[in-house]
């Protein structure tokens, strides 16, 4: 499931393009060899409409009806959070490239794998850089964040960096 419509559609289309490019490249190079067998990839897409409930329904459909054995994650922490319990329930590995909320990785999921740093580290070095550019002196930081899990994780990382550097919010 991927967001082809709704509020995440722009990023969903970019994610789909990236997945397609990777699969085309892997398949053009002969596929992946595992245990003496060679496998080529095929991706099945359904539009989750940027809706977590719909994403979870489609993940279940992909596993139960379409028989997928491996899942590539959707765009956003919220949609990944909706799909992860489904992939966990059926023991289907999911590699997600677009969900970085810390809360995704505190649930003990055995089948969820990430390629991104956690969201709380996104702006960590930005505060360090600001302090460095300020001659090593603490800085004042203005913050404005959305109320979703991802944004709040980024916010917590900024607060940690502010505290660590002696800066102020």
Regions found by a protein language model. Give the residues of each.
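Active-site pocket-shaping loop/turn-to-helix segments
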Residues: 7-16, 117
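Extracytoplasmic ligand/sensor domains, especially the bilobed periplasmic-binding protein
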Residues: 17, 53, 68-169
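Extracytoplasmic
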Residues: 38-41, 57, 63-66, 89, ...
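Short clusters of hydrophobic/aromatic residues that line enzyme substrate/ligand-binding pockets
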Residues: 8, 32, 104
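N-terminal cofactor/phosphate-binding cores enriched in small/glycine residues
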Residues: 12, 19, 58
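Acidic/histidine-rich, surface-exposed loop or edge segments in extracytoplasmic proteins
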Residues: 1-7
């Amino acid at each position: 499931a991927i967001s082809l419509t709704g509020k995440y559609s722009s990023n969903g289309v970019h994610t789909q393009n990236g997945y397609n490019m990777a699969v085309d490249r892997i398949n053009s190079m002969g596929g992946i060899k595992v245990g003496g067998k060679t496998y080529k990839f095929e991706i099945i897409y359904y539009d989750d409409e940027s809706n977590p409930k719909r994403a979870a329904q489609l993940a279940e459909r992909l596993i139960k009806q379409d028989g997928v054995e491996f899942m590539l994650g959707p765009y956003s922490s919220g949609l990944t959070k909706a799909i992860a319990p489904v992939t966990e329930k059926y023991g289907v590995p999911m590699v997600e490239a677009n969900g970085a909320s810390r809360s995704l990785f505190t649930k003990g999921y055995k089948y969820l794998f990430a390629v991104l740093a956690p969201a709380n580290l996104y702006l960590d070095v930005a505060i360090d850089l600001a302090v460095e550019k300020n001659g090593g002196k603490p800085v004042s930081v203005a913050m404005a964040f959305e109320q979703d899990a991802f944004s709040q994780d980024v916010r917590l990382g900024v607060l940690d960096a502010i505290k660590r550097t002696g800066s102020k919010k």
